[in-house]
């Protein structure tokens, strides 16, 4: 658990005052700590960009509410897996969290469109979409789940890495590539001419080493952190997926904040947006550092030509047919 916890003496003093009533407590025993303590769930370790942003959020909330509200960040999955966290938030058991888009899309299918491959040309376009009207529409839609969308976090851009060099779409034909547990990701691999394999993340290194799979896909940070470069030293920088993550509040938490002070919900929203900007900066720094380190180690990086990238885009275009009802939304995204 991260964050500075309330002292045991203060807790005991508060408990005593609650049990005996304010009249029974002297001024020296009055509880002077936060009036509201809220829990924030994060499944990444403390040094990860999203967790660092959660800690920044907690500090901002404490500062802007003048110490009246304290957010305690529980990192490393201490409060449960993401699916469990989402469910707990819906009934107010957890107050804040950072969750992946794929998990939320299980409950809010409209979000699935943001997982389509090659949806954006580059990162600036994605942030124009998410920080603009379209992103706000998606955040507002979370109200149907009793959740409040605060901001969008960066989760990097995903590319392929393989045991043998891949330079073109044709080179992917027949390869077995590990993907996340996602029907959409599996369909993408099939459309690209390869075979999808759903391997537990912790086993990907061994599967690559033992030639059970020919490659996998992920972002630079994960590629470096998991040591996959040692057994798959060829990185195809195709950037097929830019899938953001979300920082959320429970509606129950926002109601408690409003009861304490009507200004606090807006303060929380502002802190969410500011912490998201900090997360994006930190992610960009870590991503650049990881890529630099991998290149120095000897990873061979292939960047697709404009013509070759167009072939990749064309290959997955059939996936968009399943989103015919959202064709206007997709057009708005591509024109952003």
PLM regions and their residue ranges:
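N-terminal secretory/targeting leader peptides
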Residues: 2-6, 12-124, 134, 142-336
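A gly/proline- and charged-residue-enriched helix-loop-helix capping module
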Residues: 126-130
